Amino acid sequence: MRVGTWICLPGRPGRCRKQHDLGNCPEVPGIFKTLALSPGAPDMMQQPRVETDTIGAGEGPQQAVPWSAWVTRHGWVRWWVSHMPPSWIQWWSTSNWRQPLQRLLWGLEGILYLLLALMLCHALFTTGSHLLSSLWPVVAAVWRHLLPALLLLVLSALPALLFTASFLLLFSTLLSLVGLLTSMTHPGDTQDLDQ
């Protein structure tokens, strides 16, 4: 097992820009190899560690974390917050910008609804005009052929309708006369019915 000290200088998340292996330096004797420090490095970076592979054989540094894992674990949020100016963070934490933004979004929503209504009206008008233009020959044919046929049918059925109306009128008159004669021949029944 190889024991070495790796010092990583800051770079993009998941990767080290430069590494220093102090484990094999002849100037660092014995067990102090694991505690060797690079001159000028910050205290937080002067931490010795042991690099081994998956089976523990000590085959060098571990593989760097890919960008996809950095994005999926939301490391970019922390990176953005650490690099964002404090004035931006203060502006974001306040609610003064939310009301104008909400009004702007409401205005955009109203404009979109108005455009949608205009598009629907245009579609209905266009479809209706196309339907009327396509149905106009049918309406003209009905006006020329079917309407005269209907008028002729009504005129031909008019005598039959008059005869039926006169027959119903005569039948109702006969029923009235029968009722009148019955009341005159049996006046007692009429009085009983009135009581």
Swiss-Prot record:
Pfam families: TMEM239. It is found in: Membrane. It is a multi-pass membrane protein. It comes from the Eukaryota. This is Transmembrane protein 239. GO terms for cellular component: membrane. InterPro entries: TMEM239 (IPR031694). Keywords: Membrane, Transmembrane, Transmembrane helix. The chain crosses the membrane at residues 105-125, 145-171.
